[in-house]
Amino acid sequence: MWAEHLRPGHHVLDGEQVELGGRTFGFVGGGLRSPYRTPNEIDDDAYAAKVAAVSGADVLCTHIPPAVPELLYDTVARRLERGSAALLAEIKRSQPRYVLFGHVHQPLARRVRVGRTECINVGHFRATGRPYVLAW
C-alpha cells in the first residue's frame, strides 16, 4: 500500500512483526526488481534486510513468494516471476509454520512445503472464489 493512500491512524507493517492471537506475524511488502518494472520494486539487499527484520516469526506474510520454481511459474502468463532467495534462506533457517504470499496469479503450484514450512499462495483465491483460512 502506498503512503498517500493511508488514512490517519493506519500503519503499514513492512519489515515489522506483530503478535496476533498469541502468534507472531512478520510482514514484508514489495517485490524485487524485474524487467516488468512493477510498482514498489526494491533491490535484493533492501528486501533481504526486511526479511531479516522479521526473522523468527511464526507466520511470514509477503507479497512475493520464496524462490521456489513451482511457486514462481505463472501458467497463464507463461513465465517465471521473481521470487526471493533471501526469503527461501530464512524459511530454511528458521522454519516458520507458514509463509503466505500472492503475486503469481495462476501458479503452477498453489502450495509447497519447504522443510516444516507450508508456503501458500493465498492470492490464488481469486481464481477459486474461496479465500484461504489459516487454521492452527
Model-derived features with residue positions:
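Conserved catalytic scaffold of divalent metal-dependent phosphoesterases
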Residues: 1-82
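Intrinsically disordered, low-complexity regions enriched in small/polar residues
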Residues: 38, 49, 100-103, 134
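Short secondary-structure transition/capping segments
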Residues: 38-42, 103-112
